[in-house]
């Protein structure tokens, strides 16, 4: 059964579970400020094609390491809430954390249809690094489309990786397209295909199909978000990110998600610490796709999270945070060796 076939079951079970938690009145996140990073230092970085990218950062500007977090499809930077919250305490002044909204997401600007590509997202990440972290060592952390973004940057800028990147985390992502599996297979629908053509050919009539397309796409993304019972507040939070993403943006990125191929980038990551993490209940990017990518990274730490859905960093934040702490420890060792003139994997 494909993802669309699961929707009725998942939605019914999900509603029942959420109602059970609500009746118990013990939602652990009832009073959680899930938009914590709205109070962090903010700036706007202009992408190479003029699209404004919203950036937030926390930690000393002169920290020896900058960790750049890149969010996924139909999300925004606050999807890293639990990492921003916990890792600031864990890493202290040794790491500056940088977060940004990808083009067409969150508070960043709307892109043209032609620029909704993994290639362009890699260029956007490069622009963010040039603007806010032009010097020093980097750890790059990406979830879903954010992981693809990091691989795109790696292919485009192997010099940057060689000289400055000392660690990479790839969460719930893949190096190859999703046309035949996961999201691509689940959204193989003539209505969505027609809307995609309309966006390019007749932007003025796009409004007519927005509701229909959202009704097809949103349930797919919602059902795949979590593999276990989670806080109703968390469900509402992730759903708000999906709902706040323009349908035009959602559809315009589908083709690049289906067809991208960044396998060539993996060879540039074999000599630095890498963490690959995935949930075995992820229907957006199936476990097999993530593990296939990991095979090209024999020294990577592979963390398989039982029962986790696609939003592993929200569903199992403690496991993700622990993996990132381990990555930073390995990356710090690489930094020390590079500073002493020796190069090699940590």
Segments and roles (model prediction):
Residues 203-268:
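Conserved alpha/beta-hydrolase catalytic His-Asp/Glu region
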Residues 95-148, 155, 159-161, 322:
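Active-site loop/oxyanion-hole signature of alpha/beta-hydrolase fold enzymes
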Residues 72-76, 143-145, 174:
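Active-site glycine-rich loops that stabilize anionic/oxyanionic intermediates
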Residues 269-270, 276-278, 282:
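Short beta-strand/loop motif that positions the catalytic acidic residue
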Residues 51, 56-110, 131:
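Conserved HGGG/HGGXW glycine-rich cap/lid loop of the alpha/beta-hydrolase fold
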Residues 298-346:
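Catalytic active-site module of serine/aspartate enzymes centered on a nucleophile-bearing elbow/loop
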Residues 155, 159-204:
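Flexible "cap/lid" loop of the alpha/beta hydrolase fold
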Residues 2-44:
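An N-terminal hydrophobic leader/cap segment in hydrolases
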């Amino acid at each position: 059964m494909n993802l669309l076939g699961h929707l009725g079951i998942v939605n019914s079970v999900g509603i029942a579970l959420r109602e059970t938690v609500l009746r118990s009145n013990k939602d652990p996140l009832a009073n959680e400020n899930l938009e914590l990073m709205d109070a962090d230092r903010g700036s706007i970085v202009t992408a190479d094609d003029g699209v404004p990218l919203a950036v937030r950062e926390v930690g000393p500007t002169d920290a020896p390491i900058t960790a750049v977090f890149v969010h996924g499809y139909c999300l925004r930077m606050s999807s890293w809430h639990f990492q921003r919250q916990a890792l600031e305490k864990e890493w202290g002044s040794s790491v500056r954390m940088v977060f940004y909204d990808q083009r067409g997401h969150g508070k960043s600007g709307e892109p043209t249809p032609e620029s909704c590509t993994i290639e362009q997202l890699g260029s956007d990440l490069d622009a963010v690094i040039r603007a806010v972290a032009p010097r020093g060592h980097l750890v790059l952390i990406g979830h879903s489309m954010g992981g693809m973004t990091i691989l795109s940057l790696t292919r485009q800028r192997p010099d940057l990786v060689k000289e400055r990147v000392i660690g990479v985390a790839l969460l719930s992502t893949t190096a190859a397209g999703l046309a035949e599996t996961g999201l691509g297979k689940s959204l193989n629908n003539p209505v969505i295909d027609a809307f995609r053509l309309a966006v390019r050919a007749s932007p003025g009539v796009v409004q007519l199909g927005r509701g229909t397309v959202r009704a097809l796409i949103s349930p797919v993304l919602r059902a795949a978000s979590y593999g276990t019972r989670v806080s109703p507040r968390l469900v509402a939070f992730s759903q708000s990110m999906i709902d706040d993403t323009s349908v035009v943006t959602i559809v315009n990125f589908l083709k690049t998600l289906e067809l991208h191929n960044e396998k060539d980038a993996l060879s540039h990551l074999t000599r630095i610490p890498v963490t690959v993490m995935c949930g075995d209940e992820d229907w957006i990017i199936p476990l097999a796709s993530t593990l296939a990518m990991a095979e090209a990274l024999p020294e990577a730490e592979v963390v398989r999270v039982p029962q986790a859905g696609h939003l592993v960093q929200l569903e199992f934040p403690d496991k993700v945070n622990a993996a990132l702490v381990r990555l930073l420890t390995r990356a710090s060792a690489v930094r020390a060796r590079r500073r002493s003139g020796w190069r090699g994997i940590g």
